[in-house]
């Protein structure tokens, strides 16, 4: 579980432009259209994720939730995810860097159609996590290459 939390802490991003944020936040330097396309792709494939999750056919499961506070949006990975009646429920798995209305470890609910991404892992391989792709350009080359090798597309 620690491994997935560390991985997730490196993978979340924000859509707000704010200068004093945590080092783990990515607020720019990536292709915004590619990010938008990645979110659309993840949403289109969410039923596949739910199917794998219901079968418990992976090691870990997470969904990414955009959370807005005072007009600023930050995206958080939710772990320990369950799904029922069109809603995901999970635990916020990183400290906020921009919004102040949530905290690490807090339970959060989000409608299926509102998630911005999903992922599951099998061993060291990551399935889904489409919003990772546009962010790789912001990582040091060695880290990006290591992460890219774990992504299953």
UniProtKB/Swiss-Prot annotation:
Taxonomy, superkingdom: Bacteria
Protein name: Uncharacterized protein YegJ
Organism expressing this protein natively: Escherichia coli (strain K12)
Lineage: Bacteria, Pseudomonadati, Pseudomonadota, Gammaproteobacteria, Enterobacterales
Chain's gene name: yegJ
């Amino acid at each position: 579980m620690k491994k997935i939390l560390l991985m997730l802490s490196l993978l979340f991003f924000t859509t707000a432009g704010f200068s004093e944020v945590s080092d783990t936040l990515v607020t720019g330097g990536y292709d915004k259209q590619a990010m938008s396309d990645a979110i659309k792709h993840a949403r289109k494939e969410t039923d596949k994720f739910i199917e794998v999750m219901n079968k418990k056919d992976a090691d870990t499961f997470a969904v990414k939730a955009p959370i807005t506070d005072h007009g600023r949006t930050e995206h958080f990975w939710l772990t320990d995810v369950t799904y029922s009646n069109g809603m995901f429920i999970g635990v916020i798995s990183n400290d906020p860097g921009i919004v102040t209305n949530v905290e690490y470890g807090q339970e959060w609910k989000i409608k299926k159609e509102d998630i911005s991404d999903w992922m599951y892992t099998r061993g060291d391989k990551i399935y889904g996590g489409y919003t990772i792709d546009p962010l790789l350009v912001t990582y040091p080359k060695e880290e990006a290459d290591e992460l890219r090798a774990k992504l299953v597309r």
